[in-house]
């Protein structure tokens, strides 16, 4: 395999992830999830802890790979990952953390477009829109008062992609007004 091109390096990285990290969730057929460490610990292989955002980024990488070199195996993997996340998350797409939900929503939006999955981000979008506070942003997690860029950045992108541009613009305006530092960097939160 050639590694002197970005496509070659991407293919090599994908093969390493597929070989080392992709497993059935709780030995259930039709499911796949990403083990979060290598070498992996038993608790990670058994998916006792669930790193929702990590799974979202993995699904996004699988979607990127499909755009690079389409494959029916990748489409099957994406469907199995989307199904597994629903099972592992107790039958819900939502959880307590808005950054997790937004990253999973973004990954599902892209995967839906590319793979035509029978899953979508509607419940995540509803949850995030319903959590927008008077300031125009969502908190880091349910019941929290911490307002941060890591949650609101991906929420804004997800809402914009879903056509909720007014909410997305209010969020980005709030980030610019409240978290933008003089250096041009964005602070974590307030």
What annotation goes with each model-predicted range?
Residues 1-91, 114-135, 170, 174:
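Low-complexity, Ser/Thr/Pro/Gly-enriched N-terminal "stalk/linker" regions
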Residues 47-67, 96-113, 146-161:
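Well-ordered alpha-helical segments within folded domains of soluble proteins
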Residues 96, 136-138, 147, 178, ...:
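Flexible, active-site-adjacent loop/turn segments at secondary-structure boundaries
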Residues 109, 138-140:
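A generic "structured core" feature
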Residues 118, 146, 165-168:
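Internal amphipathic alpha-helical segments of the cytochrome P450 catalytic fold
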Residues 152-155, 159, 163-190:
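Active-site cradle of extracellular carbohydrate-active enzymes
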């Amino acid at each position: 395999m050639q590694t002197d091109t970005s496509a070659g390096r991407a293919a090599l990285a994908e093969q390493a992830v597929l070989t080392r990290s992709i497993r059935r969730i709780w030995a259930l057929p039709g499911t796949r999830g990403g083990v979060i460490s290598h070498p992996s610990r038993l608790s990670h292989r058994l998916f006792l802890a669930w790193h929702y955002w990590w799974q979202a980024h993995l699904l996004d990488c699988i979607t990127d790979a499909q755009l690079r070199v389409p494959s029916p195996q990748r489409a099957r993997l994406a469907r199995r990952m989307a199904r597994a996340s629903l099972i592992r998350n107790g039958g819900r797409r939502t959880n307590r953390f808005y950054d997790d939900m937004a990253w999973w929503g973004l990954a599902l939006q892209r995967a839906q477009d590319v793979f035509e999955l029978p899953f979508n981000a509607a419940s995540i979008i509803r949850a995030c829109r319903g959590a927008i506070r008077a300031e125009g942003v969502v908190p880091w997690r349910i019941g929290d008062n911490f307002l941060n860029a890591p949650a609101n950045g991906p929420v804004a992108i997800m809402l914009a992609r879903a056509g909720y541009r007014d909410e997305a613009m209010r969020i980005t305006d709030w980030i610019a007004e409240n978290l933008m530092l003089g250096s041009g960097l964005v602070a974590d939160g307030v």
